[in-house]
Swiss-Prot record:
Pathway this chain belongs to: Cofactor biosynthesis; NAD(+) biosynthesis; deamido-NAD(+) from nicotinate D-ribonucleotide: step 1/1
Record protein name field: Probable nicotinate-nucleotide adenylyltransferase
Family annotation (Gene3D superfamilies): HUPs (3.40.50.620)
Pfam families in alphabetical order: CTP_transf_like
Key words, A-Z: ATP-binding, NAD, Nucleotide-binding, Nucleotidyltransferase, Pyridine nucleotide biosynthesis, Transferase
Superkingdom of source: Bacteria
Length: 193
């Protein structure tokens, strides 16, 4: 049996990370500042339930995350969704809450906040997590049933899709991803046509 961790303020940033980029890292920093977090757990999704499948295999995405997080000791890779099946956020949140012994802080963009009521087991999400919302666009929905902290700064506007498109066109991705991730992408011919 896993013992609950000593009380700490832990943020969760779940995603496909296909690939991880500076926008993800900056979003985690914004969340740390807004909620005075002790650490952020990056949780790569093996099979995303809400999107088409990832473009590269899970092990490549995990390797890139390990490289990207190496320089920041408060950013930790947690393979909580490594099973080869769709894993829903409420499952991850319940698992983490059990380990921590308290509600985790779930980091998401305002676009996801707007759609949160459509997520599987919304009732369990709002009951078992505190949300940190990073504005990607203006927030138009109030969710009084959910505990939430809103950051006051917009994250860097970059997406994994944009990075994949640039790689496929032979364009540089310098400054969009950590240098180690850029090297890994090219050495492994990821996202090439």
């Amino acid at each position: 049996m896993i013992k609950p961790l000593k009380s700490s303020r832990t943020g969760l940033l779940a995603g496909v990370f296909d690939p991880v980029h500076i926008g993800h890292l900056f979003m985690a920093h914004l969340a740390m500042e807004a909620a005075n977090l002790d650490r952020v757990w990056f949780v790569p999704t093996h099979i995303p339930p809400h999107k088409d499948s990832a473009k590269v295999p899970y092990f490549h995405r995990v390797n890139m995350l390990e490289m990207a997080l190496k320089e920041e000791p408060k950013f930790v890779l947690m393979e909580l969704e490594r099973e080869a099946r769709p894993t829903y956020s409420y499952e991850t949140i319940l698992s983490v809450k059990h380990v921590l012994g308290e509600k985790p802080y779930f980091i998401l963009g305002s676009d996801e906040w707007e759609e949160l009521h459509n997520w599987r087991r919304y009732d369990l999400l709002v009951k078992n997590a505190i949300f940190i919302v990073v504005p990607r666009k203006p927030i138009t929905v109030a969710r009084p049933e959910a505990e939430a902290i809103f950051t006051d700064m917009t994250p860097i506007n970059v997406s994994s899709t944009y990075i994949r498109q640039r790689v496929a066109k032979g364009k540089p991705i310098t400054y969009l991803v950590p240098k180690t991730v850029e090297t890994y992408i090219h050495e492994n011919h990821l996202y090439y046509p």
